[in-house]
Amino acid sequence: SVKQSNLDFRTREAYKMLRTNIEFSGDNNKVIFITSSTPSEGKSTVSFELAMSFAQNGMKTLLIDADTRKSVMKNRGKKGKIKYGLTHYLSGKNELKDVICVSDVPNFCMIFAGPVPPNPSELVGNDRFAKMVEEARATFDMIIIDTPPIGSVIDAAVISKVCDGGILVIGAGDISY
């Protein structure tokens, strides 16, 4: 089970607008990675809320927490309900069906990060990650992948190879021009 957010009307509408922009950006944009330049810019929140927006719009949606070093998504799961995660699958300990957490929110499933591995970049770059995304493409209408910040580690660039598009989240007020 997953804890939902209580968003105000304007915030919920902003996520709907982002969802609609993705839907109209092309026919084959099924797998989207979300990253940021630095930690604490809100990419995990955007990933979660965007995935929720797709699910609430009737699309079977999978959110993958690929930020295995510093996952904040584990706080979204209800205590005691998360058994296995992405790192269990990528290291060959579990099958994909074992790590997908089916939510009580219709059309919303999630893969939590799992325990911190000693070699995160190598794990997301291995064949099992690409195989997982291909399998998920056959089952889900939309796949959102929350990745580590691109300015900190290489994981997001490695993950982007199996994605159709990406979103760079920038913290509000962090950039001046």
Which role fits each region the language model picked out?
Residues 2-177:
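P-loop NTP-binding module
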